[in-house]
């Protein structure tokens, strides 16, 4: 039987990098997630990248208003197109998260 980690080498690498980053960072969880949200917006991340942060953000007590404030703060730096793309991608990630929760509750 093949090793499961060999089935998802890209995801495994991303998970390992994220774990090291979180372990080595001295920011509070809410601040860390806000910084990561800003970085995702800056690189025009896809919805799945935001989706991976929804659970931890909720656990840290962050709100959609916090996400909006981050986008307002970075807008002059990353530009309107990236901010609008981030807003759409966050909305798509939230829709997917809600769909998964609804499916799991049935």
Report residues per predicted region.
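Acidic, glycine/proline-rich low-complexity segments that act as flexible tails and inter-domain linkers
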Residues: 1-34, 42-44, 50-59, 82-106
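Beta-strand segments within the central parallel beta-sheet cores of soluble alpha/beta enzyme folds
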Residues: 34, 68-72
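A short structural micro-motif
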Residues: 40-41, 73-80
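Short basic/hydrophobic patches in alpha-helices and adjacent helix-turn junctions
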Residues: 56-60, 73-76
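Winged helix-turn-helix DNA-binding recognition segment
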Residues: 62-66
């Amino acid at each position: 039987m093949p090793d499961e980690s060999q089935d998802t080498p890209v995801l495994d690498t991303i998970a390992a990098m994220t774990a090291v980053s979180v372990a080595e960072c001295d920011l509070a969880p809410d601040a860390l997630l806000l910084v990561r949200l800003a970085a995702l917006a800056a690189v025009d991340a896809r919805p799945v990248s935001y989706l991976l942060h929804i659970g931890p953000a909720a656990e840290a007590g962050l709100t959609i208003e916090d996400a909006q404030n981050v986008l307002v703060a970075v807008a002059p730096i990353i530009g309107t197109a990236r901010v609008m793309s981030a807003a759409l991608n966050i909305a798509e990630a939230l829709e997917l998260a809600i769909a998964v929760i609804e499916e799991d509750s049935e």
